[in-house]
């Protein structure tokens, strides 16, 4: 891992913090959670939601999206300047679901953005509380990562759909700040850079003039973020090359795709945090729990304990399986879309299945879906054990992997070997080592060739009983190696569309 000295912890990123000690970090993260909870309670009052309706995850998503939209300044400016028919740039809203005469009804609500901003600031002691907004963005991003496989997006940028384990955070908005950058996967950063370079190739003025200077510094900043995720000198040197290019073009795209492929074996460090829906924080605050006073961490036992004692409901379509819907949301809550399923099954205490085997669509309900046949059920979000989230890619080793996803991105710091399909990955690296990055390419390929099957990652790290808050007795899990490790295995997940 790169020198921890120069890096800020996630909690510091999450709270724009100067250097803080653990207690201060726990308090400031707790303060952020309190703010989200208070906002949610107030919105439920405004919308006259019953306790049950307030714990409905679909209502939570609508309320979260309303506040994110109210604070999306760039989009708000754009809407003011490009008025479109039937869209009031000053208003925000969405579907709210209520139980009327034993049936679920959809009601479309509309609020002034100004009013939503006022309620949010009031819940956050007058601050804009950007950290809380980012937290909700990351929860939405984690839910997308668990629900959709970004096949089309990968193919469009010239990458391979089997590289989906690198795509964490691919739907995060640009404005998600340092905390957002920390949770983006290598593939997500590569995709953003390739899109930028392609625009530069097609639009002569992209890098020129006053705007071009801003564009250029954004490009270099993104290169540096990606460089910071890599853990080997050769991968980093390659990023320096891409960043320093006078006129980024196809050579840089090649280098970026090469480095993304290499990350399937020489994994980058990507942060993982458990970001829960607002309807979990609201009731906890309402019950009198003081997150700021008690302290809270997104990477320890706290989210597990909170989910252990939370009641969350979801609408269920006629042919969906509530247990499968629960798995989808549970994985999203722990940022675990690309984690090894065998480890997830162990932590959760029930079998976690690949996406293609789940009888469930996304959590959100489209406006044209028929409400008459909608039922609701409790989401089972409890776990058997808890484990510390990781921001390291772990070491590498080899293992039978699947036809769909060919590598994993660990979310938990737990001893295991990380599955990846070495022969499939290495087949992509035949002979392409010419050009100015040839020495780096050769070095990267040599390291990948050397990745050994018996190597164990996170040695000595285990999972913990939920009673073991101080993480004193690690339980090192044993796995059934015959089981499938990849979530998007030979997959048929829906495609993510904005």
UniProtKB/Swiss-Prot annotation:
A single Gene Ontology CC term: host cell nucleus
Keyword terms: Capsid protein, Helical capsid protein, Host nucleus, Host-virus interaction, Ribonucleoprotein, RNA-binding, Viral nucleoprotein, Viral penetration into host nucleus, Virion, Virus entry into host cell
Post-translational modifications reported in the UniProt record: Late in virus-infected cells, may be cleaved from a 56-kDa protein to a 53-kDa protein by a cellular caspase. This cleavage might be a marker for the onset of apoptosis in infected cells or have a specific function in virus host interaction.
Subcellular location: Virion; Host nucleus
GO terms for biological process, alphabetical: symbiont entry into host cell; viral penetration into host nucleus
Molecular-function GO term, any one: RNA binding
Chain spans, region Disordered: 1-21
Compositionally skewed regions (Basic and acidic residues) per UniProt: 8-21
Motif (Bipartite nuclear localization signal): 198-216
Residue numbers covered by motif Unconventional nuclear localization signal: 1-18
InterPro entries, per database record: Flu_NP
One Pfam family from the record: Flu_NP
Homology family: Belongs to the influenza viruses nucleoprotein family.
Described function: Encapsidates the negative strand viral RNA, protecting it from nucleases. The encapsidated genomic RNA is termed the ribonucleoprotein (RNP) and serves as template for transcription and replication. The RNP needs to be localized in the host nucleus to start an infectious cycle, but is too large to diffuse through the nuclear pore complex. NP comprises at least 2 nuclear localization signals that are responsible for the active RNP import into the nucleus through cellular importin alpha/beta pathway.
HAMAP family the record matches: INFV_NCAP (MF_04070)
Subunit structure: Homomultimerizes to form the nucleocapsid. May bind host exportin-1/XPO1. Binds to viral genomic RNA. Protein-RNA contacts are mediated by a combination of electrostatic interactions between positively charged residues and the phosphate backbone and planar interactions between aromatic side chains and bases.
Protein name: Nucleoprotein
Organism of derivation: Influenza A virus (strain A/Beijing/39/1975 H3N2)
High-level lineage: Viruses, Riboviria, Orthornavirae, Negarnaviricota, Polyploviricotina
This protein's encoding gene: NP
